[in-house]
Swiss-Prot record:
GO molecular function, one term: NADH dehydrogenase (ubiquinone) activity
EC number: 7.1.1.2
Stretches of the chain forming a coiled coil according to its record: none
UniProt-recorded name of the protein: NADH-ubiquinone oxidoreductase chain 3
One GO biological process term: mitochondrial electron transport, NADH to ubiquinone
Function field: Core subunit of the mitochondrial membrane respiratory chain NADH dehydrogenase (Complex I) which catalyzes electron transfer from NADH through the respiratory chain, using ubiquinone as an electron acceptor. Essential for the catalytic activity of complex I.
Complexes and interactors: Core subunit of respiratory chain NADH dehydrogenase (Complex I) which is composed of 45 different subunits. Interacts with TMEM186. Interacts with TMEM242.
Membrane topology: Multi-pass membrane protein
Subcellular location: Mitochondrion inner membrane
């Protein structure tokens, strides 16, 4: 009974807040508020300029190695298993695959900034 009551109250509050948000439009839209902010000065150029593709490649490479760290962090807890060889083989496979990917990026000159 208590669970149903909590779910009903949460759903009701959520629906009320969503309908209020849709019914009340933004009344004060100023051009100064919607323009990009550059340290208190007027913008020198358009804020919608495209980025270099190198930024995206470096960001994707960073995300891959960040995921590697996230996958390797549970290794101390995995060391509690009886079959430690399997854990070490999987960790070495993950590190070697990522090392091969890094070597491929390096050979393809994906990490060099000079164009």
């Amino acid at each position: 009974m208590n669970l149903m009551l909590v779910l009903l109250i949460n759903t009701t509050i959520s629906l009320v807040l969503v309908t209020i948000a849709f019914w009340l439009p933004q009344l004060n839209i100023y051009s100064e508020k919607s323009s990009p902010y550059e340290c208190g000065f007027d913008p020198m150029g358009s804020a919608r300029l495209p980025f270099s593709m190198k930024f995206f490649l470096v960001a994707i490479t960073f995300l891959l190695f960040d995921l590697e760290i996230a996958l390797l962090l549970p290794l101390p807890w995995a060391a509690q298993f009886n079959n430690l060889n399997l854990v070490l083989i999987m960790a070495l496979m993950l590190i070697s695959i990522l090392a091969l990917g890094l070597a491929y990026e390096w050979i393809q000159k994906g990490l060099e900034w000079v164009e």
